[in-house]
Each structure stands twice: as C-alpha cells, then as structure tokens.
Amino acid sequence: GNSAKYVKEKLEDIGVEPEEINAVLITHTHVDHVKGLKVFENKYNIPVYITDVMLKSLDYLNNYVFLENEFDIGDMHIIVIKTSHDAPDSRGYIIISGDDSIVYITDTGYINKKYFDVLSNRNVYVMESNHDIEMLNNGSYPFNLRQRILSDKGHLSNYDSAKYLSSFIGNNTKCIILAHLSEDNNTEELAYNTLIERLNDSDTHVDNIIIAKQNKETELVKLWLRLFVLEKLKKSI
C-alpha cells in the first residue's frame, strides 16, 4: 500500500491532479491495499465504490457508493466481476468508454466461467500474474502461506494468467499488462515467457505486452483517441 501523498505525487508525474479523479473503484479491503484510502478520500472527497460487505472494513469512509452489477460514471460504463480472494466481496472490473474497454483483474484464485463471454475480446487486459508455481513451492514461504496463495482464494499463477488471457483475447485486443508480480516467487522473464508460450500454442498474438512494476507507474496506453491512465502502484488498489 502507498500513502495518499505518494499516490498524489505519482498522479502529478503523469499530469493528473487528484481533483480530476471522479471515482475510486475498490478491488478488495486488505489493509496493505487500501493504506492511503482514508486520507485520499477525506482530502479530495472522491466517491469510493464498494460493496456493503466492504464497508464493514472501510467504515471510515464518508463518500461512498455501493456497487451495482453494472453502472455508469460519466461516459464510462462499468461491469463488475466477482473475484475469489481471501478478502470479503473482492471484485474486478471491466471499464468501457465508447468502443474502448479495459479489463482489470488481480487478487483472485480463479475467474468464474460465467464471466468468460463478457471478458472476451477487450482492448486492454490488466491481469494478475502473481507467481511461478515452481518458485513458490521451492521458496522460503511457509507451507500454510504457499497453500493460501495456490488456493481458489489466493492468486493467479503465471500459468493461470496465461491460460485465461489466451482464451479471452481477440482481434480487438491491443495490449496486455501483467500485474501484481510477486517479488519473491516470480520474475518478469518467467511471467512474460509463460504468456508468450501459451499465446504461441494457441496461435494468437498481441503486439504490446507490458510488465507492471511495483512502486512505479506503468506507461500510458493509447486506445484510438482516448488515453487511459494505467498505473500499478504497489498494492494501491
């Protein structure tokens, strides 16, 4: 998690003022992901989109909106995806504006098949690629933590992420951003190569594959005439 000051500085680095933000979408309420939320929401009075269950952990919020399955923020249409993590009511999102769309899914042990159709053939995918299974099993993490990460309420491995992405991407897909890589149980090379091998096996191709880094903003991705700011600050969402 990062402080509100840090998030403000990183936004300003790419020419965005906090006052320009009109919504914060929460994926889940683990403390290390929402560290700066209280100060950020209080200082800038930005509406935070959460579930009623999330509110029990975020009861300090003053300006919040309960998530619906689908809703609009300005000219953006949001589709909410239920994820599976060891935090109550975790969520992912599809953000649509005109003909452009972004999928954002991290911190989940799997993706329910009922969402496959709506997740298919989007322009940009920000997808968790948390760990290499062999590195995790041979690493220093205790057994119970390894089991938690590998469980249906844990995190997507490189293999899982590549499997889902190879089935989701289509002719409209312009970019994949691999996110939430473990610093202890993964490498950028392993995550990238696992995805490339899976795409090659399925005879699919994506021109732009980006590895999101912790504590560093990700490059801007241009979709036709619109710019979407894609930042992966360490566990900031």
List each model region and its residues:
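Active-site metal-binding motif and surrounding structural segment of the metallo-beta-lactamase
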Residues: 3-50
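Active-site environment of divalent metal-dependent phosphoester hydrolases
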Residues: 30-34, 55-57, 87-88, 111-113, ...
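A short, charged, Gly/Pro-tolerant segment at domain boundaries
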Residues: 208-222
